Swiss-Prot record:
Belongs to the universal ribosomal protein uL24 family. This is Large ribosomal subunit protein uL24. The gene is rplX. CDD domains: KOW_RPL26. It holds the Pfam family ribosomal_L24. GO terms for molecular function: rRNA binding; structural constituent of ribosome. One of two assembly initiator proteins, it binds directly to the 5'-end of the 23S rRNA, where it nucleates assembly of the 50S subunit. Part of the 50S ribosomal subunit. SMART domains: KOW. Keywords: Ribonucleoprotein, Ribosomal protein, RNA-binding, rRNA-binding. Gene3D superfamilies: 2.30.30.30. One of its GO terms (biological process) is translation.
Length: 105
């Protein structure tokens, strides 16, 4: 199945503690989850690893969020949108369903 959400896409959170916040996708995981910049921050208790020079303590980092809880953000309409696929000049492209604009990659 083709990926509707890709790395560097601007997305908006639809459900959860960060509902309504916007961010950029930094990583797409194969498990159907994504990591979004500045969204779903969790505190991780990091053990020190002197051999690697890693300091211990409580570190705040982004956790994965399910793809079903986010939607791509359409800058033209200013709202969350759905993605469709079509072929143009022999290439498969993504487009916004609300206004048929092609999503820039």
């Amino acid at each position: 199945m083709a990926a509707k959400i890709r790395q560097n896409d601007e997305v908006i959170v639809l459900a959860g503690k960060d509902k309504g916040k916007k961010g950029k996708v930094t990583k797409v995981l194969a498990t159907g989850k994504v990591i979004v910049e500045g969204i779903n921050l969790v505190k991780k208790h990091q053990k020190p690893v002197p051999a690697m020079g890693v300091q211990g303590g409580i570190v705040e980092q982004e956790a994965a969020i399910d793809v079903s809880n986010i939607a791509i953000f359409n800058a033209k309409t200013g709202k969350a949108d759905r993605i469709g696929f079509r072929f143009e000049d022999g290439k498969k492209v993504r487009f916004f369903k609300s206004n048929n604009e092609i999503v820039s990659n």
